[in-house]
């Protein structure tokens, strides 16, 4: 039951966020020019690709959540389920990821306002905070293993590592894109090229959407872990 609710929550949040971003996306109000049909197609293709990707990965996390709840209920395993004491550092990690998502949003707002220098600083801050979050997650694995109430081979510990690792891998992939976008920002600020800056805005928008989505997924995963 909780697994189905988790799937429904992720789907609803994803759809809501995408609709909000779609309504807020008014490229004709930027720079005082109307977009051409080619510009619209060029900017829409990456957004559609990201939305499809988010929907697919949301389903993946939903399946993991369903498997988790089935295993908690005693299905499909010989080893009895023993709850894991969640490491306290997860609360700090959650706050760090919230700050990273907030920094990413500020970076987008600054860059949309043509403040590329200020936006660049917040964009880099978001990346650094994300690295801190990943380091904190690795430390959480060590804390969970040394907790004493479950062994490293227990189902609870295995699911804990699985859920946090899959989420972390998606963040690492996002950091790769963030690095490329940061390089574009530096080049765009120096070149002062209209086309380059337009592409930077699109890249930052996609990164911001992705970071917000990963924050929402982590909140769902964390709530799932705490509930059991």
Residue positions per predicted region:
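...captures the hydrophobic TM-helix bundle architecture rather than a specific catalytic motif
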Residues: 1-228
């Amino acid at each position: 039951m909780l697994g189905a609710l988790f799937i429904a929550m992720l789907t609803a949040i994803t759809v809501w966020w995408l609709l909000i971003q779609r309504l807020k996306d008014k490229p004709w109000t930027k720079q005082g020019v109307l977009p051409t049909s080619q510009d619209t197609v060029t900017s829409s293709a990456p957004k559609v690709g990201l939305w499809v990707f988010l929907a697919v990965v949301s389903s993946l996390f939903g399946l993991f959540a369903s498997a988790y709840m089935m295993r908690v209920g005693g299905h499909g395993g010989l080893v009895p389920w023993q709850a894991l004491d969640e490491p306290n550092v997860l609360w700090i990690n959650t706050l760090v990821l919230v700050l990273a998502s907030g920094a990413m949003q500020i970076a987008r707002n600054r860059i949309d306002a043509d403040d590329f220098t200020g936006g660049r600083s917040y964009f880099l801050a978001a990346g650094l905070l994300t690295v801190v979050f990943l380091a904190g997650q690795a430390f959480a694995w060590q804390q969970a293993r040394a907790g004493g109430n479950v062994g490293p081979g227990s189902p609870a510990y295995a699911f804990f590592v699985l859920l946090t690792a899959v989420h972390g891998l998606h963040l690492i992939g996002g950091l790769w894109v963030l690095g490329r976008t940061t390089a574009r920002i530096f080049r765009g600020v120096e070149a002062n090229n209209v086309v380059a800056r337009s592409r930077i805005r699109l890249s930052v928008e996609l990164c911001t959407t992705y970071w917000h989505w990963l924050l929402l997924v982590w909140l769902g995963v964390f709530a799932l872990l705490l509930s059991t």
